[in-house]
Amino acid sequence: MPAFDHFAAIAPIYARVSYSKRDVMREVASLPVRGKLLDVGGGTGRVASAIRDLVDEAIIADVSLGMLKEAPLSALKPVCGGSESLPFADGSFERVIMVDALHHVIDHAHSAREMFRVLKPGGVLVIEEPDIRTFGVKLIALAEKLLLMRSHFLAPDEIMKLFLNGEKKVKAEDGTAWVVIKKQVTPQA
């Protein structure tokens, strides 16, 4: 029996929730940038839509077809696929973001490798997550467990350890943490 898709059930509501952290994302992702952005676990496209004007092209990848059906197709390109096996070539994107989704994936390490793989050298990857070090987020984590959402929250330092390479930094405020990874440009021999 397939698992219940919590996200398809809430997609129509979620699509109406605006993204309030555009300015922080602009800062940590070094936007605007020429090129393509991939929003992994992007659901209805609410985050990608909020920053769409800062990139040439925005693609959202999500496993929930119900969420993707709510995405504004005129501005975003939806792709049904999981973070553990992204259907893109190596180095396809100048920016890769994952907002409020890492705690929902099954294999954090594999998802991190995949996101880093599709990031171009010199590109920036941003993972925005509720900061499990805060009391309010601990309550959210408990609620998601009770709702059988299989969530597993990681602290920012644990997220950084998923990435073996790249320049890493963390910004945290108001119960949210942004883990930023910049992929190094390999010098040509």
Where do the PLM segments sit?
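Class I SAM-dependent methyltransferase SAM/SAH-binding core
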Residues: 38-85
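A conserved beta-strand element that flanks and buttresses the S-adenosyl-L-methionine
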Residues: 97
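C-terminal alpha-helical "lid/dimerization" subdomain adjacent to the S-adenosyl-L-methionine
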Residues: 11-18, 47, 126-179
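A short glycine-rich, Lys/Arg-flanked "PGG" loop and its adjoining helix->strand segment in the class I
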Residues: 109-121
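Conserved class I S-adenosyl-L-methionine
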Residues: 1-32, 46-47, 67, 140-143
